[in-house]
């Protein structure tokens, strides 16, 4: 057991850990205050390669890290103290695991002799995230454990990981160094070369076999009537290449809200509504082949279509191997970047332009939305369409769960440009949406809009403290329909149950919440006021809140009315 210079050795190990993580591609570190994580915090504070983000609430901290990792396309480190501080990261870790976002949790912990004996703030932390994180348990720092062993352990745990890693770091007291300097040169001698370099201690490279379909396989697959489905695709997956592929094959491409193509004029974006239109359903029923890029499709109608259709060939393209098909259809899964797969030497389909009428049907729905949403009573769909029309490819749009993402999926306009779209649709929770959007805004450093419901905003109100650290334009649009009105769309047995146990009307407004955190705030109840407030906010350097006040049943009644028209068209 190491007893001499304990605090200094703790700090040395923390310094080695943070330095190696920086070399492994970590650019951001998110920290919550705490004593047991002091060796990590002090090391991070002096690590110039890492941007530091501090927040008092570990749940929000985890989601901020998630947003930072999404937008920066790089792993993000999170430092917490021991106890329930670690447990508060769990929702963000689950979301990151399901959506393949690399987060690295560094949790301070009590030493073994203080676990399970009634010691303060001590819980069993190893494997706290169960199957949702790769686990590395470090011993208490000890001069008998070589520094190269520590670095090798880190490299093996973190390198090339696309999902969360939990590194549990046990520290004995004292935690705060008192001596100005301790000579560890003999201890560090084996890694002297590493200290002089900038590369990780160990490096791992995977040789890709590059197995792709042959030209004969491509020719056989495109023989017949087919559909391309653009499901969830991250901005870096260059989904525009899928439009080029669709034009080359002569097949329609239908798009999910998370595909980066929902507003594209060359795509069939209104697929959710078209699948309840008799003439569109009849046309789509002729399809024999399907090529799906990504997974986690939002529209239940599109999911049902893929499940119910008797496909001759079902191909799915994913960036990494995983099961992303609830229908469990027999299929060929190709592991490849979407844009690379789309750029293969595809021949034109033998049934090119077989579904050309879908383009007309899609355009007709856009005309219907202009008439029945844009020029109708002010409401949530109208606000979302107004936001979507004002996006450019130099902006970011984070869409919250529950009703906002569904309204965007159903009613987004056809436009010539659109923002990079971000969501949390792994576990699809309403927690941490504001914090995640803050991370996206900070890492992206571009004008960013968050569309979020009132219950989701209340759930993550603490994260307005993170929002005030954003320096680029960051507009938080809260759609306040006074409760969880997504349940208006679900078959709850009666209205009293819906009101008492599901909707949970609260009668709250967000003005004082914004004021508490010093954020600019506007409350609007008309389209003209909303557009004026939103366009101004997008020129404002920093965060602002726009609260859109609407009637409880406005969105659900509008959805039902439009659905009725579509079914009869």
UniProtKB/Swiss-Prot annotation:
Gene Ontology MF, one: manganese ion binding
Catalytic activity, as annotated: isochorismate + 2-oxoglutarate + H(+) = 5-enolpyruvoyl-6-hydroxy-2-succinyl-cyclohex-3-ene-1-carboxylate + CO2
Signal peptide positions on this chain: none
CDD domains for the chain: TPP_PYR_MenD, TPP_SHCHC_synthase
Cofactor(s) it depends on: Mg(2+); Mn(2+); thiamine diphosphate
Cofactor: record remark: Binds 1 thiamine pyrophosphate per subunit.
EC number: 2.2.1.9
Keyword Magnesium: yes
Domain of life the protein comes from: Bacteria
Keyword annotations of the record: Magnesium, Manganese, Menaquinone biosynthesis, Metal-binding, Thiamine pyrophosphate, Transferase
Sequence intervals crossing the membrane: none
Self-association state and partner proteins as the record states: Homodimer.
Family: Belongs to the TPP enzyme family. MenD subfamily.
Entry-linked NCBIfam families: menD (TIGR00173)
Protein name per its UniProtKB record: 2-succinyl-5-enolpyruvyl-6-hydroxy-3-cyclohexene-1-carboxylate synthase
Organism field: Shewanella halifaxensis (strain HAW-EB4)
